[in-house]
Structure formats: C-alpha cells, structure tokens
Amino acid sequence: MPLQNVKVADEGSVNFQKVKEECITAMESLHKVVACYRHLALTIGGSSDSIHLRDELRRTRERAQELALSNRNKLTTALRDKKLSKKDREELERLWVEFSSCLELFHNDMCKVYELGMAVPHSATNKPAIQTGSTGNTSAIASRALNVQNINYSDSPANKASLEYQEIEEEILKVDNMITDMEMKVNVLRWTVEANTRMNDELKSTHDSSSVVLLSEEESNSKGCCSDGQLIVFLLLCGTALVAITLYSIL
C-alpha cells in the first residue's frame, strides 16, 4: 500500500507539472497576441489605417480568443481538482489572476477598437480619414501574433468595404461572458493571491545594483582625475627644474 500511494502521488505531481507548463506556455502566447493587438489598435484613424489593418485586427482578435478559451478550460479543470495540494493551488491561482487580468486588458482594447472604428469609419476608397499617426506596414506586427500557433487563415481580407461592427460587438460580448463564466466556475479572490516575489525586494535589488554602478563610476572618475592631477604636477616640477638649471648656467 505505501508503494502504491507513492506511485499515485508521483503521477499526480507529473500531471500537475504538465498542466502548469501548458498553462504557462499558453499565457506567454496570449500575452504576445494581446500586445500585438494593442499595437495594431493604436494605428486606427492614422495614416496607416487601411482595410488590411482592420482585417489584421480581426484575425489577431480571433487568435487571442482561441488562446484564451484553451487556457481558460485548462485552468478551470485544474483548479476544480480537489486533490490539489495547497502549494500547487497557490501556483495555479497566480496563473489564474494573471490570465484574468490579461483577458480584461484585451476586453478593454476591443472596446476601444470598436469606439475608434465607429468614430473614424474607413472609406471605401481606402483613404485615411485623418492624416496623422504612425506610418509603415503593420503586417509584420500582426504576423508575430498569427505565428504563435499553427492555425490557418485566409490571406484575403474578409472585410473589404467596411468594418463589421456587429461582429466586434459579438466578440466583445463573448469575452465578457468568458470573464463572467470564469468567476462563476472558480472562486479565486484576487486580493488573497500572493506574488512569488515582493516588490520591496525587487526595488532593493535594483537600487543596490544601481548604487554599485554609480560607486564604480565615481571611483573610476576619481582615479582619472587623480592621474590627470599628478601629471600636471609632474610637468610643473619638470618645467621649474629646467628654468632653474638654465638660470644657473647663465649666471
């Protein structure tokens, strides 16, 4: 019986590590996609605004929703396991808080994109409504988000004429429902979740490292000043000696 219990415990720890690694990988991918979506959203209404930009926003938005849905299911299943140890549950709760915060930021960006799209509708002639903002091609930004996982999309833009505001409304509602469903299925109180590291320790380590750098720079500067001063004194002494020798020879 003891050997059996040890074997079951080992299998449980292996499964937890696997789920944890999958969740961390999915979180990293979601962070990249949400960051790319925010970067693309900043160009709406500017000189880089185009039908292709709106389509890249749509595809990046779909990718973020797929990653969020996959990660939500994994975290929900893992946190509802009653056999989890206290330490394992705390680690999953930290991932849960990180995931929900990222999802809320994505929801806010989607609302901003919707409002900007309504305020600055794209014309059928593909001309920017406002001649300001950043310039350049945005396809490289979106490609970093779309290459996170191997999911095939059509290269042809789906919205040639105008942005489908109804589709964005449905996607915003879908993300909103996902956040509500997360809070209903798993009761994780954010204010009870503790971080792995303390902010004071990070600030202290940063301050210590910066202090060491400043001290080393001051020491090097002081050494340079001392060497320069010694050289000047040596030259003055040599000049004085030469003048004395010259006067002595003349007299």
From Swiss-Prot:
Please list every transmembrane segment annotated in the UniProt record, as residue ranges: 231-250
Q: How does it sit in the membrane?
A: Single-pass type IV membrane protein
Q: Name one GO biological process term.
A: negative regulation of signal transduction
Protein localization: Membrane
Extracellular topology ranges: 251
Q: Which domain of life is it from?
A: Eukaryota
Q: Which GO terms describe its cellular component?
A: membrane; neuron projection
Major location category of this protein: membrane
Query: What spans does the record annotate as topological domain Cytoplasmic, numbered to this chain?
Result: 1-230
Which terms are listed as keywords in the entry?
A: Coiled coil, Membrane, Signal transduction inhibitor, Transmembrane, Transmembrane helix
Q: Which residues form a coiled coil?
A: 52-94, 158-187
List the InterPro entries hit by this protein, alphabetically. RGS7BP/RGS9BP (IPR026512)
What is the protein's known function?
A: Regulator of G protein-coupled receptor (GPCR) signaling. Probably acts by regulating the activity of some 'R7' family protein (RGS6, RGS7, RGS9 and/or RGS11).
The family note in this entry says: Belongs to the RGS7BP/RGS9BP family.
List the protein's name.
Regulator of G-protein signaling 9-binding protein B
Give the organism's phylogenetic lineage. Answer: Eukaryota, Metazoa, Chordata, Craniata, Vertebrata
